């Protein structure tokens, strides 16, 4: 999309914005008989942007490739497609969404690669296609702008290889089966977004709460998550969530959702940063507090003067821990 933030990373657009663009492209194609090359979409920030289409394959009225900008989401480059046709209100199936667009009625149906919600705690009811509230609003607003003012219409959306893409998302753990979700409150994708990461944690905790769970395991990465699962083999999959560097945000979310027990699985360097009270533990945000670690070692192992001196030459928490006899590490880490 061309927009860049202060880190010079390129913004993109969400699957929800793609759905709105495809719907408008289908509407224009019905009106003119020609698939448009670009489609104007009004985003949640109140700005209009032009999204490119590509020639649709047979059986499709509109088709496009999702551009996620410099965000690492697995849906970047995914092919989305749609069809639009007149229908009757009672053509809606139980899993379809029925949307009111002024005097018009839009029945929203997934035909390939979009999941179906099976649990509480998500932004669409159980049993419905996984198209959340933001995209549903974008759809009706943009179709109204394009001239859809009456009648009943069936919009069929699909994502090529969506079921495979979903394996690389949280959908299987959140109870979304069969494909990806159509997401995006504003339609914009901020690259490597702090807000997006924290929102993912919030969704996982909320889903856990609404399924009756009262405990979470916050893991800072893949290795710590694997280690935590070995230590807690009887805890359910839905209890384990990767939080990256956002310890303070994640603990706040757990408190607001009344979690009764939270286990934090992390490497020693991040543990030291937690002890120092840092809200964000990324290496670019804050350095390891070696002085704090030395004070902890002196308090837990007061007679080890040679060790105290050696720690002054340690460049990292990991290196320092290797200097501590194995029997003394547990008191230092848990003291």
Describe the residue ranges of each PLM region.
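Generic N-terminal targeting/processing segments that precede catalytic cores or assembly contacts
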Residues: 1-168, 172-174
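A structural signal for small-residue-enriched, beta-sheet-centric alpha/beta enzyme cores
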Residues: 2, 10-16, 174-180, 185-334
